[in-house]
Amino acid sequence: MKKITLLLLGATCALSAGAQIRLGDGQLSGSFETNSIYYVDDAKMTDVAGYAVPEDRFGSNNYLKLDYNYGRFSAGIQMEAYMPMLLGFNEIPDAFHGFKLASKYVQWQDENFGILVGDIYDQFGNGLIFRSYEDRALGFNNSLEGVRGTYNFGNYVQFKGLYGRPRLYMDYEDSWIRGADLSVSLADIFGLRDAMFTLEGSYVNRFQKIDEEKSLHQGVSDQVRPNLNMYSGRLNLDWKGITARFEYVTKGEDDLFSVGAKGNVAKGNVYLAELGYSHKGFSVLGSFRRLEHMATLLSIYGEGTGNLINYIPALTRQYTYLLTNLNPYQVNPDGELGGQVDVYYSLRNKSARYKYWNLHANFSTYYTLKENTQNNKANLLWRDINVDVERQWNRSLKTSLLLS
């Protein structure tokens, strides 16, 4: 039977609405978002592989969020309905389906102390060892169902600890995440008023019972242990236009889940450094990162792109225009080495501030780690050199020129 391919979106509807209501001394706020599409065939492109017509021509992702605030107390829920989920929303069949109370929380927050019970969204440092967040456009939500406590000792010390089980698509996994994050402001302790200087550290543990039958079926290494530990140390400095950020991450032995390496274990690490300077209309920022074996899963038995506990962004230029974003860089979590340099200068007319020139240049490049290649050489993964000039001629005319 000839397969009919689906290529044309016949009707698309995206709607978002919000409201606030006063309830005595409290306040109730709500928002509703729906993204719905009706699919039709494109008869001229029926031979393109990979786009089959779904059983239901209609796809709809819907989110209803309600929050109540009363002084230092707050509570909220989020309902989600996939009727069914949009085509191509996730590579896992039925990852999102039906109608469900997807998240909920109850929170108390005063000046120095806070506690939250429910679904937690948080991040330690740059997110290299832990980040729980929601991105509806990508169908991503890895919140933790559990408890989080925070404590601030003035501006000197900030501490938070959390414990919970992670969400994977519409359900919660059988793994458990616990972690703590500490930030100490040395600038405040020593009275350095013109600077921001902090030392920070984080710890994250993933615990999951080993199922030998599942491990054998999914090709998980028999060397994987129930406990996985990760540590992060960070230094942050801001002083008279100078910015410096350093972070080192170490990760215990974990299964290598990449194609061709699954069934083996290895330790992971990250070196991250950022140096920048800004003065008036000029700024320059350089970033360097080396990482190895940092794909950290919520569950060793989970599947899909939603099965991640950490966040490793691409340190490359994020373009404004669609054409230049057709081939973005994808981070290689198995191992990469590289960075970027970004330079910006703005020249403004002193008598007419709305008239200006913006000059911008960026260079980024990444290589594989030679230890992970068969020829023991670092191979080029990505290189991008770009320059753009933006000119605001008057209040109604602006031109942009980009070379990449």
What is the role of each PLM region?
Residues 1-4:
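Positively charged n-region of N-terminal signal peptides that target proteins for export
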Residues 10-18:
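Hydrophobic h-region of N-terminal signal peptides that target proteins for export
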Residues 21-27, 33, 37-59, 69, ...:
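Signature for the C-terminal beta-barrel architecture of outer-membrane proteins
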Residues 62-66:
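Histidine-anchored nucleotide/phosphate-binding helix
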Residues 100-102:
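Extended catalytic core of nucleotide-activated donor transferases of GT-like folds
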Residues 104-107:
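N-terminal accessory beta-strand-rich subdomains and adjacent acidic, glycine-rich linkers
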Residues 120, 124, 133-134:
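Acidic, small-polar-rich N-terminal luminal/periplasmic segments of exported/outer-membrane proteins
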